[in-house]
Amino acid sequence: LRKRSYAARFQWFEENADQFDDLYDKLVKLRHEIATTLGYKNFVELGYLRMGRSDYGPDEVSNFRKQIVDHVVPIVTRLLEQKKAILGLDHLYVYDGINFKEGDPKPKGSPEELVKGAQKMYHELSKETGEFFDIMVNEELMDLVNRDGKRPGGFCTSFPKYDRPYIFSNFNGTDHDITVLTHEAGHAFQYYSSRNQPLVSYLWPTMEAAEIHSMSMEFFTWPWMEQFFKEETDRFKYKHIAGSLSFLPYGACVDHFQHWVYENPEATPKDRKNKWLELESIYLPNRDYDDIEFPKSGGIWQGQLHIYQMPFYYIDYTLAQICAFQFWIKSEENREQAWSDYNRLCRAGGSLPFTGLVELAGLKLPFDDGCLESVVEKVSNWLDSVDVSSL
């Protein structure tokens, strides 16, 4: 069933492959033309400027990607071997996305009970988060439950005129429901905290900095996960950490691919698919698509909307994840100091560029040599300490 579902998805992509190739080819060439008309060598530099990356460039990101290959890919390979044992499989294919034989953890309670539990959690976390979440509940600033005709997805937006954030999602009875109440609430809390910044452009930071608040809130709320997951709490935490770490190589692969694409705007669709397969062998060496032809031939990236719609917006998630891991590590050592640093970061909004915000929060820059290695070593040690047979 897993294989048939995965194959059915990419059957649609295969049937429309020529249209996707043509569309992306036009986008790449148009973006290249815009960049060269403005005096840039190619779209890479312009793409960075459009993302507001005024304090780092492709060289720093390239170094970061290299660290992921050196220090994260081997750990993910080990986690996949462990997953194979957990599931009792002789071989893992890309469609073997389940994490536990018994299924993934599920939150206990109705949507109303989950929100009530979150309200209690945020009051216990801090005075500021308690006040913030009361406003979200009392002013009905969250549309959380799935219903017929509702658009998919989840996000946080804002109403600057009223100094209020807004959370949208589709609860579906999975652990993702709790992630909404932590991840999107992290975005919303940052906006609430920075609402008094003097400029509208300072209310939100750039994309990679914005994800620090959301991903870090996922970890700051860990002490309360038992009230949502009961006996499945350890399973939830393991999935959370392992999944966050395992995402890093894919995120880096998408970024590396986009750099190559815009540095080689005359490449053909076939060239791009071959390049994806080459990069996949570096960042995701354990992927096996079985006999599903479209992803096997290098087309899987066409299912990633960011690549079409928001060029260079993807490495942001990986940079923020390393910062969030640092907050998790700090909170395990000195929770009060970690929360103080996080609060200071949220209040700053977008008044500083990414590197300035990271330094303000007392974190190490993910680009810097040694940062990623030291962070993932602690994450790996935590994963190694878990008795996965008991999950």
Set out the residue ranges of the language-model regions:
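Catalytic Zn2+-binding segment of zinc metalloproteases
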Residues: 186-200, 220
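Short beta-alpha connecting loops at secondary-structure transitions
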Residues: 166-170, 197-207, 236-242, 261-262, ...
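Extracellular zinc-dependent metalloprotease catalytic-domain scaffold
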Residues: 161, 171-172
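Short, charge-rich amphipathic alpha-helices with coiled-coil/heptad character
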Residues: 1-6
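Contiguous, non-catalytic segments that form substrate-binding/exosite surfaces or channel walls
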Residues: 10-166, 364
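C-terminal, non-catalytic "cap/extension" segments appended to globular domains
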Residues: 145, 181, 189, 216-219, ...
